[in-house]
Amino acid sequence: MKKIISIILFSLALFQTCGRIYAQDETFGKTSLRPKLKFEARLDYNNDNKNDDLSGIKGYIVDLKLEGDLSPRFSYKYRQRLNKPVKDATFFDATDWLYLTYKAHRNISLMAGKWIVAVGGWETEPAPIDIYQISEFCNNYSCYQWGFNVIFNTTNNQNQVYLQICESPFRKQYKASTGNGKEMWAYNALWIGNIDFFHAFYSANMMEYRPGKYLNFIALGNRFDLGRKVALDFDLQNRASRASDFFKDYTLSAQITYRPLPAFQCFAKISHDRNNTGNGSDPTVFDGTKLTRLGGGVEFFPLKNDNLRLHGHYSYSWGRNTNPDGVLRDGQSIVNVGLTWRMHILK
């Protein structure tokens, strides 16, 4: 009940603020109401020495993206995965985004709907169709949830702050393990900042992993532009359900990307997941896990844009994963090559 009252009061305060702002700033000029519609698909050949079911030629992702404006103040975005199985008898399990944004002021927006959970780190930033290698944490984390966002944007567009209330990404895992579909929430604050060659993707998060029990995150995503052709990412994510857990449950990841030509890019990446808390509160990286993944790949863009992409990637994992249903395994070797194409149906 306290959570419900807090959410209602928070919403009322936002709408009251919006009313005042709207009275001060009534127009943003003309806008086009023509929607944009894009079709995306990726076809892969995968060879996984630890999982034969994932080996072979596979359709990896097919999705549709729709976005546009309803007015100068209202905009929408929608992305539906056509290949993702629908679970729990709901169409929206295959929906990544479905949200409406209200631009209350040049520097303040409100968003409601399904969107990514506001956790920092550049590893979580790419769309699934653009991902080749992720950590064990990301493999066990439901990153798209229903919720509400308040977005503050600086006038120079170099900094954004997101305040978010959404459903906990651990709700389905709790239901699967206990059989109880309880209401569970996450409270997130995210800062995206651009300071010359440095780009920050930082967050602080409180997420219920059981009703009334919170797993707290500090996620620090750092990107450095090393000239025009090289970028270096370094992410640190610490998870703790109590103060004594600090830096006992964490994920580190780093990636370097080199793009010497518009049509060619290569990268190398490493991640390390570890949980030594002994309390079993983290549903993503189980207690006793100590796991490293190293890999690299190349991308070729024959059309010199992202409408057509060829890729090749290899990764190797080693260590201990105590999650019996985990994704990464000791001695796991994965080879992946594939083709991605994007079609602009409406521009």
Predicted feature locations:
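Aromatic-acidic/polar surface patches that form glycan- and anion
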Residues: S55-I57, D93, N139, N180, ...
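Short glycine-rich loop/turn motifs
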Residues: G147, A186-N188, A219
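Loop-centered beta-sheet repeat module
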Residues: Y162-K213
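Short, well-structured alpha-helical patches and their helix-loop capping segments
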Residues: S135-S142, G179-E183, S271
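Outer-membrane beta-barrel pore domains
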Residues: R34, E40-D52, D88, Y99, ...
